[in-house]
């Protein structure tokens, strides 16, 4: 298993294109969620995952719906933590068991870039 396929039923209305789906989510966040004033912050986990998909990381989902239990969840957690606390996640040195040095670097890069530009995918340098 691995990343969602173009014929995945949830992506059908977006032509099987994850980036189109991401753009629609970002648009809704900017036009509906944030202007509502009901939320303190945005945790752009979807953007972080899309950022990671531009890297050499490989699959980030385990069954087309759920993030991998190691690096996928770590990216989401880093993004949530950084967005919620405002702390600089590039200073984090810890990674869960099963996340190697390369995955760690990609996770930090992907999450930090998502926090910096939450509505735009940032191509990885890794």
Where are these regions (language model features)?
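Catalytic His-Asp segment of secreted/periplasmic serine-dependent ester chemistry enzymes
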Residues: 5-115
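Long, charge-rich low-complexity segments
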Residues: 112-126
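Cell wall/extracellular polymer interaction/catalysis modules
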Residues: 1-2
């Amino acid at each position: 298993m691995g990343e969602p396929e173009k014929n995945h039923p949830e992506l059908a209305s977006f032509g099987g294109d994850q980036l189109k789906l991401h753009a629609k989510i970002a648009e809704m966040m900017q036009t509906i969620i944030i202007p509502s004033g009901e939320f303190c912050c945005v945790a752009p986990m979807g953007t972080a995952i899309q950022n990671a998909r531009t890297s050499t990381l490989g699959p980030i989902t385990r069954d087309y719906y759920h993030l991998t239990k190691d690096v996928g969840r770590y990216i989401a957690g880093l993004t949530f933590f950084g967005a919620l606390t405002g702390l600089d996640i590039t200073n984090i040195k810890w990674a869960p068991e099963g996340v190697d040095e390369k995955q760690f670097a990609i996770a930090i890069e992907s999450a930090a870039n998502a926090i910096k530009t939450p509505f735009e995918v940032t191509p990885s340098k890794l």
